[in-house]
């Protein structure tokens, strides 16, 4: 089976639609940005992904579905630093430092998430900014944004 387009996301399904038999494809965060790949489901079925559109995969994307079954994307846990600034100054200070290092970050209402880096952990300790080191699933890929200093 070759998957060429995403058929939706389980977050947008009704409770009835979520009752289908679910097969999962577990991906590393770095694999979410790959348009072409061969993967194996948790039931041992091999499928090819060759997306026509240049989009990143996300947790819950539906790769295939019929009347009774669906295959969805799940994401393996990631080794993260979860940064919890107490105020705008701390948030600005650490965001500036991370930006200077060109580190991709993700944000929730109260947290900044970055892939684990011992140098950043040392910096957080030095600055006294609250953080935790966690194994956590993220819904989308960490992506570097290119730029130049011209």
Swiss-Prot record:
The keyword Cytoplasm applies. One of its GO terms (biological process) is urea metabolic process. Keywords: Chaperone, Cytoplasm, Nickel, Nickel insertion. One of its GO terms (cellular component) is cytoplasm. SMART domains: UreE_N (SM00988). It is found in: Cytoplasm. It comes from the Bacteria. It holds the Pfam family UreE_C. One of its GO terms (molecular function) is nickel cation binding. Its main location: cytoplasm. InterPro entries: UreE, UreE_C_dom, UreE_N, UreE_N_sf. The keyword NADP does not apply. Belongs to the UreE family. Involved in urease metallocenter assembly. Binds nickel. Probably functions as a nickel donor during metallocenter assembly. This is Urease accessory protein UreE. It comes from Staphylococcus epidermidis (strain ATCC 35984 / DSM 28319 / BCRC 17069 / CCUG 31568 / BM 3577 / RP62A).
């Amino acid at each position: 089976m070759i998957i060429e387009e995403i058929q939706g996301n389980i977050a947008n399904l009704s409770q009835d639609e979520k009752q289908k038999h679910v097969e999962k494809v577990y991906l590393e965060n770095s694999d979410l940005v790959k348009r072409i790949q061969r993967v194996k489901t948790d039931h041992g079925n091999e499928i090819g992904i060759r997306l026509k559109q240049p989009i990143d995969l996300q947790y819950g994307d539906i790769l295939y579905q019929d009347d009774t079954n669906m295959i969805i994307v799940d994401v393996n846990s990631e080794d993260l630093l979860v940064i919890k600034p107490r105020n705008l100054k701390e948030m600005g200070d650490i965001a500036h430092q991370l930006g200077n290092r060109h580190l991709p970050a993700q944000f929730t209402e109260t947290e900044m998430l970055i892939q684990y880096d011992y140098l950043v952990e040392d910096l957080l300790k030095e600055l006294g900014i609250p953080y935790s080191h966690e194994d956590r699933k993220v819904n989308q890929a960490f992506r570097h944004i290119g730029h130049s200093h011209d």
